[in-house]
């Protein structure tokens, strides 16, 4: 199953109700689960983003639907990254031909 990294920032609405964010996280995890998406990890972060989440979804379309639904609630804005495992990374890099002019 593909892995995605979601970078979240609280909106003005979200930060005003920050004490309710753990309950919203639980509800979001359950809604994702019902959609076939697994919220594997959620981290409170210091810096540019307020939360970083590791998410598995069956495909890009399912993930996009879930993350857009999350954003539409107005508590967070999101930026998403598709992630590749270390094994996938090694396979991708290993497939690079020595002569890059032969793409």
Model-derived regions: residue spans:
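A compositional/biophysical signature of low hydrophobicity enriched in polar/charged and small residues
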Residues: 1-103
């Amino acid at each position: 199953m593909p892995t995605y990294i979601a970078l979240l920032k609280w909106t003005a609405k979200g930060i005003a109700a920050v004490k309710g964010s753990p309950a919203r996280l639980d509800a979001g995890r359950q809604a994702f689960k019902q959609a076939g998406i697994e919220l594997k990890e959620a981290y409170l972060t210091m810096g540019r983003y307020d939360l970083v989440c590791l998410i598995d979804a069956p495909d890009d379309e399912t993930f996009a639907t879930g993350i857009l639904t999350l954003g539409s609630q107005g508590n967070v804005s999101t930026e998403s990254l598709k992630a590749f495992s270390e094994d996938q990374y090694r396979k991708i890099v290993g497939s690079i031909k020595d002569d890059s002019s032969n793409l």
